[in-house]
Amino acid sequence: MKDKLITLEEIKEAYKKLKTHVYNDSFNLRLRTKLADFEYDKDIELLFEGLLYDINNDNIDKYLSKISTYILPKKVPSKKLGNTNIVRNDVCGFFDDIDLTEEDYNFYIDAPIEIYLIDVLWMMKEGFLLIDSQIKNDCYGNSLVFETNGDSYGIKHGHYLFERYFDKYQKWRDNGIKIAREQTQHKNDVLLVCLDIQRFYPTSLIDFSKIQETLQSRNSDLFLTGILERIYVSYQNVLDEVNRRKSKFPQLPIGLLSAGIIANWYLSDFDKEIKERFNPIYYGRYVDDIFMVLGNVKPNKNEDWFDEKFLYEEGSPLIPEKVIDNNNEENKRYKLRSHSNLYINSQKLKLFYFAPNHSLAILDNFQKRLDENSSAFWFLPEDDANETLNSIGFDIIYDDTINKFREISGIKNSKYGVSVFLTKQIKKEIICRDNANTSLKEDLFKYFTGNRLIDMYSLWEKVFTYFVVTNDTDAIRKFENSICKQIDLIKIKDCNTNTQLIRNSLQKHCTYCKNMAMALNYDMIDDIELMDLPCKLRSTYLIRQHYTPFPVIIYTDSKINNIISSDIYNELLTSDNINLTIIQVAPYINPRKIHAHEICLINLFNYIKNFSDTHSSFDSGKLIDELITYDLCSDINLSQCKGVKLENNDKQEVDIPKTTCKSDEFGNAKQQIKVALSNIKISNNDLISAIKGAPILNSAKRERHFHLINLSTEEKVDCLLLPEVSLPKELLVTYAEHSRRKQQLIIAGIEHIVSYNKCFNFSVVFLPYIHKGNKEVFILPRLKNHYSPDETREILKYRKQVPTLSPSIYHLINWQGVQFTVFNCYELADVLHRSLFKSKIDIMFAIEYNKDTCYYSNIVEATCRDLHCYFIQANTSDYGDSRLSMPKRSVEMTPVKIKGGDNDTIITFTVDIKSLRDFQRQSTLFQNKEDFKNTPPGFDHDFVSQRDSR
């Protein structure tokens, strides 16, 4: 027996990377389903040990024999109705058949999970060495995540194999545009060149002897490379049998992750030739798409100018050829000199010339469109009467001006637009279902019809999901039947075998799509025999977790059929059958990182369910320890210590724990913070309903909060402040995700939460930070110390109880160097409690639902000067007095103050932390009263420096 070449830990690492990739992939549902079946209810360690033995003993024939293939459409070609000048909206359903040629579909590898694991192991152990510095610089697609620390070179340990697709694609495109702009600003001519290799994967020829040669030159083992070659050859034999031909070399298998790495290496010599011949100021390749920028190049009027200048000389990397197409017309294509099997269609060669003294309108409008598309994912979905499926789902093609109807020459489908639109509708319906869009169902069936239904097969899952979310079983059946009917119309020219194969493949894909949707709500499954696959997908954590209102619930033992119900929060807090303990899942089983805010919320709900007046404090110190265990923070990020503990005249204890929150690479403290002060109206009816234990979350309230979040994103604020009892508990995850992604501090009051007859009023602070390159947010809730008399009467009126804290608790928080505390409305009336923060804070935030603005205005002004800090408070807009106040003379004290209005909005301002601290560091005698009021007697100047936590 050979020495052990692969270890069990390496197989676990490979499985973790494979599962994470599959989880984040929105396309390959067949592999996702295979993975769920492979793992579900199995002793997975035993499976790994079996694979370990087979690999190390070169016993993989049993896996190779199970390799097969399936076919999915690449595109559905549009048909024309002869020589007609009629523009029709029913062309997609006008023809009886859907005819496909070789250009219109792709073969995909279908193999046992063990094959995919060997594939990833090869990348981890040997394949990564194919990627040199040139490939790293030139290639933006399939970019491996390399270890950046220390002297080791290899793929980084953790969940991810590749860098995020969206980020790399954006860089590939934006870097070229940026350089082109810079050249025009320097008065240089610029030529943008876009190339696309025709059918790259299917026409590639991979010679593994050259791969071995490259790896040997870099001191790599070749054991796994030999196994990988057998996988590629076995798959090629399957393709050759299907297509009745014999290949000398295997092609790149679509569906194997290693193909992306080998593809980048395979074309690296072509990259080098192109750069040497064209000398571009920017060159980038995304798989088979090439984008380069040439400087100081000015085309002439000759149609063949580009070929004459760059391609007719000896040694050109592209060789022009004349070809006759299917319509017996002569066309041009370009053969790659380094790979004579690869071609670039002349129609895919695009040149864009920009003279520095002329308009850059094309570049500007293209960039604007890109920005609009990318920003679609920055904002939460708001209702827009003008945004319908019909307006989003089509792009109108004009011959001339858009103002004349006769200039319309046609329409084309917008797959991207429909995808974004459906995602928005799904999210809105999950959060609130008070008025499902009945017209959308009709529009969906009108849109997904005819050959367009097949062309949009990648969106089937989203349509099924929408119908599951809206509990529409009839629509699910109807949509499935429509798909089946259209699949039966597909024909592949001159190949009955492939016709049957693509039909079977699409039928399976339809089943996978439906089951992915059903896994979100078992109540939609009316046949127990159909529970198998949805149950496997959910149990292995491979569902679309981002759709669920409380994603971490699937990591508990809770048995909840419908995990996309917005009512899930009420169940969490009132049901004894729901266990809110996170199951310890092996890292290689969990396809995603559980975030800090999810653990925080689990702890909050457990605190509420298990609340005891005799032992009532929320143990955030224990929570921080738990986060450290999950590697979601370190003592660099979050720390807690007892700040103050004293007794007032009534012998009541007051406890002030201090929480420090900052990012790993925290530099200087924030000198200023930009604050968004909300101006929203809190409905008294909503308040009373929440106290009764029947909170209202309708579309209007959802829209209000989405709008506020989007405004804060648009304004790029550091902090968002909302009033008391303004935040529905159902939106806690939404706000936490926003705070995490945008690294935005959020302070708000949660609507009253009733659990076991106790009525809780919480303030909550979302504290974002970065840990090991990952964005996280720590949620710090605090139960109100002093319920107001009016509030207490309402609670007792409806036979609920007021929970009491002993001792009273306030938080002293240092976030990124800014030190503050939060008071919840009636707490401000306690002068002793306010005084505890003298010298200790830069800002006092106050959240209120308060009619008595005159009284509280006096408190604000007194507190602002007595504590010598900024005072920022948010109240419901109908009572007003939301404001920023500063310890300055009266005419300058309150530069921001808002009240009233019908629309919900925010007002932003910048709070200068540095200037206040610089002033407070000075001895009172030397302070300039033009800047701020003098610090009050007893102010501890030494405390100022302690606020800057570094």
Indicate residue ranges for each PLM-predicted region:
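Conserved two-metal-ion catalytic palm core of "right-hand" nucleic acid polymerases
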Residues: 1-223, 448-450, 491-498
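N-terminal, active-site-proximal structural segment of metallo-dependent hydrolase catalytic domains
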Residues: 26-44, 618, 625, 632-719, ...
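Conserved polymerase palm-domain catalytic core
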Residues: 177-287, 291-305, 343, 351, ...
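C-terminal polymerase-core module
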Residues: 297-446
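CN hydrolase (nitrilase-like) catalytic-core segments centered on the catalytic cysteine
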Residues: 537, 541-556, 721, 726-752, ...
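C-terminal beta-strand edge segments of enzyme domains
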Residues: 550-660, 862-863, 875-950
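Active-site catalytic loop in hydrolytic enzyme cores
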Residues: 629, 633, 637-668, 758-839, ...
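Active-site-proximal beta-strand elements of phosphoester/diester hydrolases
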Residues: 672-694, 781-783, 818-827, 845-848
